[in-house]
UniProtKB/Swiss-Prot annotation:
UniProt KW keywords: Cytoplasm, Initiation factor, Protein biosynthesis
Keyword check for Cytoplasm: yes
Protein function: IF-3 binds to the 30S ribosomal subunit and shifts the equilibrium between 70S ribosomes and their 50S and 30S subunits in favor of the free subunits, thus enhancing the availability of 30S subunits on which protein synthesis initiation begins.
The UniProt record lists the keyword Cytoplasm: yes
Record GO biological process: ribosome disassembly
Protein name according to UniProt: Translation initiation factor IF-3
Assembly notes: Monomer.
Gene Ontology CC: cytosol
Family the entry assigns: Belongs to the IF-3 family.
Length: 175
């Protein structure tokens, strides 16, 4: 978790005077710190130094506990939003001579990943003599692409690399 900025509150404020803003956001003007503290105390709120670098520093009358809570809430929302937008690439590996039921299970997993917005990298593995029949891999790749064509588009075309044929599917963009 990131560290929230610490603000000086009430008696922690060291300035002699400040530019005061009330709880409604109205600027009151430049007043001595003691007077600002008195006004805040009368209203049952805190005096918070929100811009210490300004000359004179800017202080606002507010409920500091509520202010900190709102800041934490905004930070949580920002982190959540950031997490939602991360696209992962999920790997699915299978043999070229995969059984029908196993293929259906793999297709189901790929469909779930694509519906969640993730990309899917498919690795078709060739073993032994299968290497001399790359058309087996091409057929399987075409079948997978056709089965998922309603929700996915090919981002990287099927390509043979060593003992694997690799291609990447991405979720279709919403219009």
């Amino acid at each position: 978790m990131s560290k929230l900025k610490e603000y000086r509150v009430n008696r922690q404020i060291r300035a002699k005077e400040c530019r005061l803003i009330d709880e409604n956001g109205q600027q009151i003007g430049i007043v001595p710190i003691e007077e600002a503290l008195k006004i805040a105390e009368e209203k049952g709120l805190d005096l918070v130094e929100i811009a210490p670098q300004a000359k004179p520093p800017v202080c606002k009358i507010m409920d500091y506990g509520k202010f900190k809570y709102e800041l934490k809430k905004k930070e949580r929302e920002a982190r959540k939003k950031q997490r939602e937008h991360q696209i992962e690439v999920k790997d699915i590996r299978m043999k070229v001579r995969i059984d029908e039921h196993d293929l259906q299970v793999k297709l189901k997993h790929m469909r779930e990943f694509l519906e969640e917005g993730d990309k899917v990298k498919v690795w078709l593995r060739f073993r032994g003599r299968e290497n001399i029949y790359p058309e087996l891999g091409k057929k399987l790749a075409e079948r997978i692409i056709n089965e998922l064509s309603d929700i996915a588009e090919v981002e990287v075309q099927p390509k043979k690399e060593g003992n694997f044929m690799i291609f990447v599917l991405a979720p279709k963009r919403k219009k």
